[in-house]
Amino acid sequence: MGKGGNQDEGATELEAPMPTFRWEEIQKHNLRTDKWLVIDRKVYNITKWSSRHPGGQRVIGHYAGEDATDAFLAFHRNLDFVRKFMKPLLIGELAPEEPSQDRGKNSQITEDFRALRKTAEDMNLFKSNQLFFLLHLAHIIAMESIAWFTLFYFGNGWIPTIITAFVLATSQAQAGWLQHDYGHLSVYKKSMWNHIVHKFVIGHLKGASANWWNHRHFQHHAKPNIFHKDPDVNMLHVFVLGEWQPIEYGKKKLKYLPYNHQHEYFFLIGPPLLIPLYFQYQIIMTMIVRKYWADLAWAISYYTRFFITYIPFYGVLGSILFLNFIRFLESHWFVWVTQMNHIVMEIDREPYRDWFSSQLAATCNVEQSFFNDWFSGHLNFQIEHHLFPTMPRHNLHKIAPLVRSLCAKHGIEYQEKPLLRALQDIIGSLRKSGQLWLDAYLHK
């Protein structure tokens, strides 16, 4: 056991020699009320401070008892600034005989990945092209203008209404990809400007909450496809995913829905309802319950603008129906694109892998083309995005060949597929998981 196991959090000055710890002891501090983690072989007690973590206490808590070095590097842009907040939390370091990686994680893969990150920095791949993002914002605003002009010029008949709805759904989908860029701090050097524009895009252009998105999405990036850590695989008993969950449900005789038919009812309750029903309700309730008043003000500005614009054409009730029809269309786009990279991959309990291996196990790519890039917001490069979440999306294709080479060196599968096959694989994955559930339900 290491020395200093009862060190208090918040010690600002540690007298030499600094207390040392073994992994065996560090791994015990992985509770909600007792959290340690390791960054660059330094041990930090984040128990009380985690509630003040700007990215949310859950995302940092998911690394309690582990080495979080690569996650730390991946999520933060200004490392020197962030390290100022870490100094009071420092309680010691790893014992000299201890490996830098916990639980037997592959140190060679980690070393090679960090060298790859250094190469990306040397290639200036973390520098953004401001014009790229400005043009994306401009084409979103242009679509909003075209939508209004269509109704103004042609009237509110069925055909102009449907055309306008599709234009606005496209605008909303593209705004979703754009807010994703700012949310990941990948546009401006200063985090503050990314946060400000993120609130504008997700709040004023989409009517959603930046804090809600951060809370969910950063957890997804930290622990992708890990049950109880990645909120994106929490399907609220509506679907069973991967191989472990359906078998567990089957063994326990859990049958909230006929999961052997989930690949069929997915079309009825997945793409159509996620945004207009579940997300819309969850976002509003989260802003109110958690008192995200600034986010709520931004969202109100979106709804105010929308209803001022469209009540003259449809009235109050008609505008509400029109809004939800747009959400309905956007939801299909969002669900298919976001699920094609993850739901078909490994979904399991915590395996405690290194950063590189964990991201490759949970993500796959879709072939590059101008349409695929635009349609998916460059999330067709999901592997590279997960490895380097702060890298501007227009540079992801530049690092992809080097990522592929690193995968080949270590025998890690790098999956890339055509768009249509990626979409089809979603259904195949749901069918497979449903059959695993049925077999376990009937025979185990």
UniProtKB/Swiss-Prot annotation:
Pathway: Lipid metabolism; polyunsaturated fatty acid biosynthesis. The protein sequence includes a number of characteristic features of microsomal fatty acid desaturases including the three histidine boxes HXXXH, HXXHH, and QXXHH (these domains may contain the active site and/or be involved in metal ion binding), and the N-terminal cytochrome b5 domain containing the heme-binding motif, HPGG, similar to that of other fatty acid desaturases. Its EC number is 1.14.19.3. The lineage of its organism: Eukaryota, Metazoa, Chordata, Craniata, Vertebrata. Residues 1-122, 169-264, 327-444 are cytoplasmic. Involved in the biosynthesis of highly unsaturated fatty acids (HUFA) from the essential polyunsaturated fatty acids (PUFA) linoleic acid (LA) (18:2n-6) and alpha-linolenic acid (ALA) (18:3n-3) precursors, acting as a fatty acyl-coenzyme A (CoA) desaturase that introduces a cis double bond at carbon 6 of the fatty acyl chain. Catalyzes the first and rate limiting step in this pathway which is the desaturation of LA (18:2n-6) and ALA (18:3n-3) into gamma-linoleate (GLA) (18:3n-6) and stearidonate (18:4n-3), respectively. The gene is FADS2. Belongs to the fatty acid desaturase type 1 family. GO terms for biological process: alpha-linolenic acid metabolic process; fatty acid derivative biosynthetic process; linoleic acid metabolic process; lipid metabolic process; long-chain fatty acid biosynthetic process; unsaturated fatty acid biosynthetic process. Keywords: Electron transport, Endoplasmic reticulum, Fatty acid biosynthesis, Fatty acid metabolism, Lipid biosynthesis, Lipid metabolism, Membrane, Oxidoreductase, Transmembrane, Transmembrane helix, Transport. A motif (Histidine box-3) lies at residues 382-386. This is Acyl-CoA 6-desaturase.
